[in-house]
Amino acid sequence: MRISKPHLRITSIQCYVCLLLNTHFLTEAGIRVFILGCISAGIPKTEANWEDVRKDLQKIENLIQSLHMDATLYTESDVHPRCKVTAMNCFLLELEVISHESRDGDIEETVKNLILLANSSLSSNGNITESGCKVCEELEEKNITEFLESFKHIVQMFINPP
């Protein structure tokens, strides 16, 4: 599977370390560059991931309009901030239903990419356990339009945390 977002490509830090060890690492400036490089490599870039998730979600919405799907999906319409990871996992599971029922290659590819991006962003939050949140099957079933609107709202919660 190919991720279509260029900022998610992993750079090989080993090459930089080897280069620094063989040339400038013995100077004070080389040590500073090495330390700053190590620090910047550890900074998560989840904000960009959620923006890309939002863009893929918009693309899915546009593609679905041409298919006229009438599926109903478990939808969390009033997400509490302390349950946003649980709600996002439910949305991602339901998104697979859209992918399966659409039988459209563009939707399937975009859904796979969106799920990959969202999961990589969620993994940066660590293993968060949220108690008191509804499980997916307890959520109200709504049409695709309402599902996508609620999905966009929760993605926005990850982009701009309360």
From Swiss-Prot:
What the entry lists under Gene3D superfamilies is as follows: Interleukin-15/Interleukin-21 (1.20.1250.70)
Gene Ontology cellular-component annotations: extracellular space
Which one Pfam family would you cite for this protein? IL15
Q: Which InterPro entries match?
A: 4_helix_cytokine-like_core, IL-15, IL-15/IL-21_fam, IL-15_mml
Q: Which domain of life is it from?
A: Eukaryota
What Gene Ontology terms describe what this protein does at the molecular function level? cytokine activity; cytokine receptor binding
Q: Where do glycans attach?
A: N119, N127, N143
Report the SS bond pairs.
Answer: C83-C133, C90-C136
A GO biological process of this protein is:
positive regulation of peptidyl-tyrosine phosphorylation
Secretion signal, residue range per the UniProt entry: 1-29
Question: Which residues are annotated as pro-peptide in the record?
Answer: 30-48
Primary site of residence: secreted
Family listed:
Belongs to the IL-15/IL-21 family.
Q: What does this protein do?
A: Cytokine that plays a major role in the development of inflammatory and protective immune responses to microbial invaders and parasites by modulating immune cells of both the innate and adaptive immune systems. Stimulates the proliferation of natural killer cells, T-cells and B-cells and promotes the secretion of several cytokines. In monocytes, induces the production of IL8 and monocyte chemotactic protein 1/CCL2, two chemokines that attract neutrophils and monocytes respectively to sites of infection.
Query: What is this protein's name?
Result: Interleukin-15
Name the source organism. Marmota monax (Woodchuck)
Q: Which gene encodes it?
A: IL15
